[in-house]
Amino acid sequence: LDLSPALMRELAMVKIALVGLQPDAAGKLPSELSGGMIKRAALARALALDPDIVFLDEPTSGLDPIGAAAFDELIANLRDTLGLTVYMVTHDLDSLVSVCDRIAVLGDKKVLLEGTIDDMLASELPWVKLYFRGPRARMIAPRRGKGA
């Protein structure tokens, strides 16, 4: 792309605002930003060229539960508003439920199961069952029995 510096700055400021950062964040070093702000800045950078697909690797890792929920909401809103396809690698069950409509469970160097959260909850595969219905699956527990 052959964009003028002024247009590049304007587009960057639009993306910064889109992810919920204040304009002054543009002039700050990463060391001056919180963990959540760094993640938002990274998301703004990923959106810079208006992609159709965004790849996210553990986007809520290191965030407190409130920050993680806010980031999940941001991802879902951007997905819906911009028509994005989001591929997300995560171990965060809360994020899976909040953001994902399709899930692929990987193990043993292959896809073990692919489907919706309800498909995961209904699975009798031992590892999938333990992961999605085990002791850490508190948020998705209310979904058990709903379509599963």
Question: What is the predicted function of each stretch?
Answer:
Residues L29-L33, M37:
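Conserved ABC ATPase signature
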Residues T90-H91:
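H-loop/switch region of ABC-family ATPase nucleotide-binding domains
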Residues A48-D52:
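A short, proline-enriched helix->beta-strand linker immediately N-terminal to the Walker B motif
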Residues L7-D24:
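Conserved ABC ATPase "signature" region
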Residues L96-S98:
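A short, surface-exposed alpha-helical micro-motif characterized by mixed small hydrophobic
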Residues V54-D57:
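Catalytic Walker B motif of ABC-type/P-loop ATPase nucleotide-binding domains
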